[in-house]
C-alpha cells in the first residue's frame, strides 16, 4: 500500500509538470478513467465490473502512457497495469507495450525468465483513412508454448469504420 501511494504521488507530480509544460512546449497530457461492467480484451474475459484509469503524455508524435484495470466487484480479482511507449507520424504508428497481469504471488518488478507476469508486445500499423491495419507480436515475457519455446503470439487488426 505504501508503494502504491508513492506511485500515485509520483504520477500526480509528473502530470502536474506536464500540464505546466503544455503551454510552452505543446506537450499534451491525458488523464481519464472508465468504468466497465466487464473487461474483455481481444475476446477474452479478464474481469467483471472494473475501473480503468489512464495517464499519458505526448510530444511531437512520441507518447508514453500508463493504463490500469482493477475489479471493483472483487478486490482480490484481476488487476492489470500497462505501460506503452509509441510514436506516430501521418498514418504510421509503432509502439511497445509492457502488460502486467497480477497473478497473486507475482510482484510487478519480477522479470525472471519463465516466471514473470509481464508480457512485452511490439506493434506497427498504418491508417489509410477508410481502412487501418495494426500488427501486434509478443516478443518477451510470459509468452511460451507448452514445450517452453517462445510463442511470439501475434494479433492482426483491420479496422474499417462504417
PLM regions: where:
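Cleavable N-terminal export/targeting peptides
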Residues: 1-28
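Outer-membrane beta-barrel proteins
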Residues: 20-162
